[in-house]
From Swiss-Prot:
Span list, region Disordered: 1-44, 468-509
Organism: Arabidopsis thaliana
Binding site for ATP: L149, G150, Q151, G152, G153, F154, G155, Y156, V157, K171
Domain Protein kinase: 143-423
Stated family: Belongs to the protein kinase superfamily. Ser/Thr protein kinase family.
Gene: PERK15
Organs and tissues of expression: Mostly expressed in inflorescence bolts, and, to a lower extent, in flower buds and siliques.
Name of the molecule in the record: Proline-rich receptor-like protein kinase PERK15
Enzymatic reactions: L-seryl-[protein] + ATP = O-phospho-L-seryl-[protein] + ADP + H(+); L-threonyl-[protein] + ATP = O-phospho-L-threonyl-[protein] + ADP + H(+)
Length: 509
């Protein structure tokens, strides 16, 4: 076989492999390997992801901001509304009070305006029952004289029966009386907020045009004045006198020390102490009463109160405080002890016409030697408990001291009656009549002699006046106006309201 026909065996061409030796002159430097995968993987669309997340954040932030702003605006609106409402309410309250004061100071009343103003003020501030004039007219048989209990300087008192059968005493103030309007306001402001078994209860009121009426609980057994001083009355037993004294003292102690603010009665007297069938005492007639917030700065330019019961400091300074009430209750105690009136009507200008001046030397003697002859009501015929009499005389003596700040508190009087403190604690070692200082600032230039001179001046002015009047509420239980307090004589315990300016014999505090 020739060689031409034999295919030649040749090696296949060697494959070409890229060179593993980099050309440093032309090849770029190798990059660092990626930690998340091969370099050939497509990158995440970072730009698109940032846009979506930002939108969600903006939306969430906007939502939170809207909620916060909305809540803030709502809260702010509520605060503004509350502030505006309270401010408006204060203005309305102030305006109502100003309207009342304006109506009080006017000589003639505008029935339409004053009725509306007083009704709005009373119903919102007092909260007592509001009666119509027709209700009360029907209850008293058209204010018949047969139902007349008594009358005073500013009105009449009738017995009445309400629709539900409740027996009441209805005080009708004289129309157009400025003082009567003041007393109406004082009564509903004072007695509507005090509640005590020894204070008469106010059941409601009526305002119709110029008519002003007050509705009280009916106290059936008349007044202390009636039982002590009315002619042909049986002698009041000592035990009943003691019970009445304790009850009246408790009622006054409540006004002075348990009320907030404390209340000064300013017309404590036997005619204003009502008695029920059990001979429990109820203090009545708050027409002159004031809270301590008023009396701290108030100087009266009218003679307020009742002659024979007025405290010495009032004759000089024109101020009445709780210690003035204490003096007045001391006079009532002397009436219970002696059976005498506070002023001797047969000697209205005598030096010793006052029960206080008459009784002081006798009280000194009685407390020193235990001899009550000449001091105690002879109608008792020595039928009394000697220990109770000693305590009552000691209470009376301490209460009528000329020095107002040395008079005891009413709570001390109550404890002394109950035997819970000694007489020495009550009297503080001072005999009746020893103290002539009365002024609260400690000055000593006002004596009992000067007091008598001032009191004479007051009496003379009241006798010459045609406008003085008595305590109308003292007739709450007296029949047909026969209660002596309804007479025109100030020597029988007459209240007067003549305008004067008391002389300032001491420094006013």
């Amino acid at each position: 076989m020739s060689t031409d026909t034999i295919p030649s065996l040749s090696s296949p061409p060697a494959p070409e492999f890229p060179s593993t030796t980099p050309d440093t002159a032309t090849s770029p430097a190798p990059s660092q390997p990626s930690i998340i995968g091969p370099s050939s993987l497509a990158p995440f669309p970072e730009t698109t992801t940032n846009i979506d997340g930002g939108s969600r954040n903006v939306a969430l932030t906007g939502l939170i901001t809207g909620v916060v702003l909305g809540a803030t605006f709502v809260l702010l609106g509520v605060c503004i509304f509350v502030c505006f409402y309270k401010r408006k309410k204060r203005k309305l309250k102030k305006k109502k009070k100003e309207d009342i004061e304006a109506s009080i100071n006017r000589d003639s009343l505008d029935p339409k305006d004053d009725s509306n103003n007083l009704q709005q003020w009373s119903s919102s501030e007092i909260g007592q029952n509001l009666f119509t004039y027709e209700d009360l007219s029907k209850a008293t048989s058209n204010f018949s004289n047969t139902n007349l209990l008594g009358q005073g300087g500013f009105g009449y008192v009738h017995r009445g029966v309400l629709v539900d059968g409740t027996l009441v005493a209805i005080k009708q103030l004289k129309s157009g009386s400025g003082q009567g309007e003041r007393e109406f306001q004082a009564e509903i402001q004072t007695i509507s907020r005090v509640h005590h078994r020894h204070l008469v209860s106010l059941l409601g009121y009526c305002i119709t045009g110029a008519q002003r009426l007050l509705v009280y609980e009916f106290v059936p057994n008349k007044t202390l004045e009636f039982h002590l001083h009315e002619k042909e009355r049986p002698v009041m037993e000592w035990s009943k006198r003691m019970k009445i004294a304790l009850g009246a003292a408790k009622g006054l102690a409540y006004l002075h020390e348990d009320c907030n603010p404390k209340t000064i009665h300013r017309d404590v007297k036997a005619a204003n102490i009502l008695i029920d069938d059990s001979y429990e005492a109820k203090l009545a007639d708050f027409g002159l009463a004031r809270s301590s917030l008023d009396t701290d700065t108030h100087v009266s330019t009218r003679i307020m109160g009742t002659f024979g019961y007025l405290a010495p400091e009032y004759a000089s300074s024109g101020k009445l405080t709780e210690k003035s009430d204490v003096f007045s209750i001391g006079v009532v105690l002397l009436e219970l002890i002696t059976g005498r009136r506070p002023v001797d009507k047969s000697q209205p200008f005598a030096d010793d016409d006052s029960i206080v001046d008459w009784a002081k030397p006798l009280m000194i003697q009685a407390l020193n030697d235990g001899n009550f002859d000449g001091l105690v009501d002879p109608r008792l015929e020595n039928d009394f408990d000697i220990n109770e009499m000693t305590r009552m005389v000691a209470c009376a003596a301490a209460s009528v001291r000329h020095s107002a700040k040395r008079r005891p508190k009413m709570s001390q009087i109550v404890r002394a009656f109950e035997g819970n403190i000694s007489i020495d604690d009550l009297t503080e070692g001072a005999a009746p009549g020893q103290s002539t200082i009365y002024s609260l600032d400690g000055s000593s230039d006002y004596s009992s002699t000067q007091y008598k001179e001032d009191l004479k001046k007051f009496k003379k002015m009241a006798f010459e006046s045609k406008t003085f009047g008595s305590s109308e509420c003292s007739g709450l239980t007296s029949d047909n106006g026969q209660n002596p307090s309804g007479s025109s004589s100030i020597t029988e315990g007459q209240r007067t309201t003549q305008e004067i300016e008391p002389e300032k014999n001491t420094k006013d505090t």
